[in-house]
Curated annotation (Swiss-Prot):
It catalyses: L-histidine + H(+) = histamine + CO2. This is Histidine decarboxylase. The gene is Hdc. Catalyzes the biosynthesis of histamine from histidine. InterPro entries: Aromatic_deC, PyrdxlP-dep_de-COase, PyrdxlP-dep_Trfase, PyrdxlP-dep_Trfase_major, PyrdxlP-dep_Trfase_small, Pyridoxal-P_BS. Homodimer. Residues 489-518 are annotated as: Disordered. It holds the Pfam family Pyridoxal_deC. GO terms for molecular function: histidine decarboxylase activity; pyridoxal phosphate binding.
Length: 662
């Protein structure tokens, strides 16, 4: 125990250290655009920086503070950077930070009203504020005479979707037991089926795994939206099979291309068929602060639950997820447990949020949300959304001005998807060139058989200069890729190609071709000082090699198949005419030491036996893939994190260890 005088010294010491940390955070956030966005580290980098065991005696604060830059920052992806475009935003702000600082100091566990009345009541009022700000139906309000619903803060949209599915399952099983009183719940549960689009977030699939409810992923239209016709057809098919439809998860703002499902078509079907309609607006929900963007909410009056993340675009840092339910009693009957030690004198009259969630304990999340709404006001939050949307429009205009690129899906809100015209390997190569420098962070996805790049405007501090700088880096990478592609694969249309002069790797080229419709036609590069794709220190340099799979396909073979088996894998399997043994990222991503040289007289382009040996290593299913297999988005390929000799594991790729092919 500390003596009173020792405690006073301790308190004063950490008061000074707290000010020091606030200054550090201020400096970090104000200069974050100057940092390299992605780290240049490999898995396990941190272990060598730390002792094997915890210290027996206290470390000095100066030593701890110094390790922030020495140990932590070298491995950080800077999500607050204006050059972070990979994922949907995860923003913060000073009011949010200060709110959580206070909440962490109070550190109450607000599972019941009695455990902390302010925690419960502030949350109820703020959730009503937020529902009105977004234009949600009145039945989602706590304080409304005709409402049976209300809102609550959850940790993630993933958890909210699971909660909604569990509540829908419980409600449907109770209705089924009324007709089949002798049936047990497990047999009834086995007949349930839920629906979502094939563009929905992976959390919907995970919710089905946890709840043991079958999930059907339904096809979308040309705009990647789930329509009523597809849902009605699936319901009729499943009823004929003796299944019981129970739940639909509609997405407003899908992960891949920010598409919007048609609530106005799905809602009436759910109402007539008795299905729970859950709406996932994780990213796009913040946009509904702006009345002009609420057209996507048409049909929201049919929703049984709605969720979105203020922790994405609303400048309230993680974790903070808004979740509203139309009928709170259906939620409470799913999660209510009431041991005597959790009861209190006002149990019947007060709201106890422990009955609205999976865990018991809950953080005082509403303080930071309260601070943000009051500090910015609705008008400034709306201006923030409009600014992000305008920056995305500006980037879209830059992409459309360059004939070498295409935009295969309509821009919505702050997300633009684009690709380099031509085979997928070109777009993949552009991403790899960008990743080597680490000056901006982009990730791919696939729509149908096309590899695309997602560009999300994230930071509230993004300027046109930031967008222009990043576009310059993208063009620079594209020029480099196109010049290498044209010089390594001569064709009748490539006769006008101007080869890059020696030593121009990492420098922008004025043009790589002259005229024509070829993707490598003459292109104007917008130059900006101080931004180039110079390779970061310690980065690897894969030598250009002929692709041994090229002759294994006919010219009619889909580009997707070539891309999946050839470009994506072989670039990681070969370096300087040497093959590497590799394993998928589902295993430990540690470079394998065994390398085998190719025979000097072995031709990568000739010899059927060599070709047969290559394909013998792949599952038969891989060779039988159809075009439709690629329509579902492959989300979040984290390109900068690829170890040099590891191949990515995804559903459409061979998920098995790959042996050296010699």
């Amino acid at each position: 125990m500390m003596e009173p005088c020792e405690y006073r010294e301790y308190r004063e010491y950490y008061r000074a250290r707290g000010k020091e940390m606030v200054d550090y955070i201020s400096q970090y956030l104000s200069t974050v655009r100057e940092r390299q966005v992605t780290p240049n580290v490999q898995p396990g980098y941190l272990r060598a920086q730390l002792p094997a065991s915890a210290p027996e005696e206290p470390d000095s604060w100066d030593s701890i503070f110094g390790d922030i830059e020495r140990v932590i920052m070298p491995g950080v992806v800077h999500w607050q950077s204006p050059h972070m475009h990979a994922y949907y935003p995860a923003l913060t702000s000073w009011p949010s930070l200060l709110g959580d600082m206070l909440a962490d100091a109070i550190n109450c566990l607000g599972f019941t009203w009695a455990s902390s009345p302010a925690c419960t009541e502030l949350e109820m009022n703020i959730m009503d504020w937020l529902a009105k700000m977004l234009g949600l139906p009145e039945y989602f309000l706590h304080h409304h005479p005709s409402s049976r619903g209300g809102g609550v803060l959850q940790s993630t949209v993933s958890e909210s979707t699971l909660i909604a599915l569990l509540a829908a399952r419980k409600n449907k099983i109770l209705a089924m037991k009324a007709c089949e009183p002798d049936a047990n719940e497990s047999s009834l549960n086995a007949r349930l089926v839920a629906y979502t689009s094939d563009q929905a977030h992976s959390s919907v699939e995970k919710a089905g795994l946890i709840s043991l409810v079958k999930i059907r992923f339904l096809p979308v239209d040309d705009n990647f939206s789930l329509r009523g016709e597809a849902l009605q057809k699936a319901i009729e098919e499943d009823k004929q099979q003796g299944l019981v439809p129970v739940f639909v998860c509609a997405t407003l703002g899908t992960t891949g291309v920010c598409a919007f499902d048609r609530l106005s078509e799905l809602g009436p079907i759910c109402a007539s068929e008795g299905l729970w309609l859950h709406v996932d607006a994780a990213y796009a929900g913040t946009a509904f602060l702006c009345p002009e963007l609420r057209g996507f909410l048409e049909g929201i009056e049919y929703a049984d639950s709605f969720t979105f993340n203020p922790s994405k675009w609303m400048m309230v840092h993680f974790d903070c997820t808004g979740f509203w339910v139309k009928d709170k009693y259906k939620l409470q009957q799913t999660f209510s447990v009431n041991p005597i030690y959790l009861r209190h004198a006002n149990s019947g009259a007060a709201t106890d949020f422990m009955h609205w969630q999976i865990p018991l304990s809950r953080r005082f999340r509403s303080i930071k949300l309260w601070f943000v709404i009051r500090s910015f006001g609705v008008k400034n939050l709306q201006a923030h959304v409009r600014h992000g949307t305008e920056m995305a429009k500006y980037f879209e205009s830059l992409v459309r001005s360059d004939p070498s690129f295409e935009i295969p899906a309509k821009r919505h809100l702050g997300l633009v998807v684009f690709r380099l015209k031509g085979p997928n390997c070109l777009t993949e190569s552009v991403l790899k060139e960008i990743a080597k420098a680490g000056q901006l962070f982009l990730i791919p996805a696939t729509i149908q058989d096309k590899l695309i790049i997602r560009f999300t405007v994230t930071s509230q501090f993004t300027t046109k200069e930031d967008i222009l700088r990043d576009w310059h880096l993208i063009q620079e990478a594209a020029n480099l890729v196109l010049s290498q592609h044209c010089t390594s694969q001569p064709s009748p249309r490539a006769k006008n190609v101007i080869p890059p002069p020696p030593g121009t790797r990492g420098l922008s080229l004025e043009s790589v071709s002259e005229g024509g419709d070829d993707p490598a036609q003459a292109r104007k590069i917008i130059k900006q000082p101080g931004a180039s794709l110079a390779r970061r220190e310690g980065g690897s340099d894969l030598e250009t090699m002929p692709d041994p799979f090229d002759d294994c396909f006919s010219e009619e073979a889909p580009n997707t198949t070539k891309h999946k088996l050839s470009s994506f894998l072989f670039s990681y399997l070969s370096v300087q005419n040497r093959r590497k043994t590799t394993r998928s990222l589902s295993c430990n991503s540690v470079p394998m030491s065994a390398q085998k040289s190719l025979p000097a007289d072995a031709s990568l382009k000739n010899g059927g036996s060599f070709r047969a040996r290559i394909f013998s290593g792949f599952p038969e299913q891989m060779m039988m893939m159809k075009k439709g297999a690629f329509k579902k988005l492959i989300k979040f390929y984290s390109v900068p994190s690829f170890p040099e000799c590891s191949s990515q594991c995804a559903r459409q790729l061979p998920c098995c260890p790959l042996e050296a092919m010699v």
